[in-house]
Amino acid sequence: MDEKTKIYDITIIGGGPVGLFAAFYAGMRNASVKIIESLPQLGGQLSTLYPEKYIYDIPGYPAVRAQELVNNLIQQMKPFDPTIALEEAVISVEKQVDGTFEIITKKDTHYSKAIVITAGNGAFEPRRLDLPEAEQYEGKNIHYFINDLSRFSGRRVAVCGGGDSAVDWALMLEKVASSVSIVHRRNAFRAHEHSVNNLEKSSITIKTPFIPTEVLGNGDKLTHITLQEVKGDTSETLEIDDFIINYGFVSSLGPIKNWGLELERNSIIVNSKMETSIPGIYCAGDICTYDGKVKLIATGFGEAPTAVNNAMNFIDPKTRVQPMHSTSLFE
């Protein structure tokens, strides 16, 4: 059987942190594993949206940079050598007559005995700055993602938004940029209280309640933004080198909605085994929901072994759901 027709034990749809840990855990169970990821790299939103940000609620890490966590998860699963298919968005999943699954992507067809979906919030894209002329500066010095903090060294940066991402980025940019301003349409920020306290103590210029009403540039790059006071008459123009927009993201399940799974809003319903309404398909992480669900990376790390162990039992009912402890496996 060649690679094109190989039937894997477990195929993981989604290569974010929970998917990577699921791949490691499935490897510990001696499963053959494939990861299918729609993005060009592993790591999901951690790598794509905020690789430089620090995460504070991962067990065992007082603080860990998002990309560092992803790198560690990749290193952790490497001994089991899972097959990785990048830039492949899954279009459909169909159960075959023999009980295996056919997974069709935009590039290829894959086969698996069981599936674990770890697709996070599904497909996502940023809410864009809805102003004339803004689009021509996207990818130049209007940014929706930050992959390298050092590129802003010594530059005048404005951040627009009032949530955690906006405040966190402003605080991180303060360390490298020559000046940072944060613009929010309300007086109060929605970010975590601790972050807002740090913002108020920082050297960052806070512009509230203001909204950007005009972007000005020379065609090659943005040079100024005009701000207007909300429900007021004050307006001002800022000279900047970079404009970072943090209006949040619009997510969608996309084709997952058509796979025949039982859904609740934009989440897949699972039982205590992390099993979906289709036997053999399991979920872990933010993509799934159940009574009392809390959407955290740490929660997904706990759900992944449950999904994998029950998937192994589905493949072979003689297999124990409760495995040996890892300390025994690696001695």
Swiss-Prot record:
Belongs to the ferredoxin--NADP reductase type 2 family. Homodimer. It comes from Listeria welshimeri serovar 6b (strain ATCC 35897 / DSM 20650 / CCUG 15529 / CIP 8149 / NCTC 11857 / SLCC 5334 / V8). HAMAP family: FENR2 (MF_01685). This is Ferredoxin--NADP reductase 2. Its EC number is 1.18.1.2. The lineage of its organism: Bacteria, Bacillati, Bacillota, Bacilli, Bacillales. InterPro entries: FAD/NAD-bd_sf (IPR036188), FAD/NAD-binding_dom (IPR023753), Fd--NADP_Rdtase_type_2 (IPR022890), Ferredoxin-NADP_redctase_2 (IPR050097). Binds 1 FAD per subunit. Keywords: FAD, Flavoprotein, NADP, Oxidoreductase. GO terms for molecular function: ferredoxin-NADP+ reductase activity; flavin adenine dinucleotide binding; NADP binding. Its cofactor is FAD. SUPFAM superfamilies: FAD/NAD(P)-binding domain. It catalyses: 2 reduced [2Fe-2S]-[ferredoxin] + NADP(+) + H(+) = 2 oxidized [2Fe-2S]-[ferredoxin] + NADPH. Pfam families: Pyr_redox_2. FAD binds at E37, Q45, Y50, V90, F124, D286, T327.
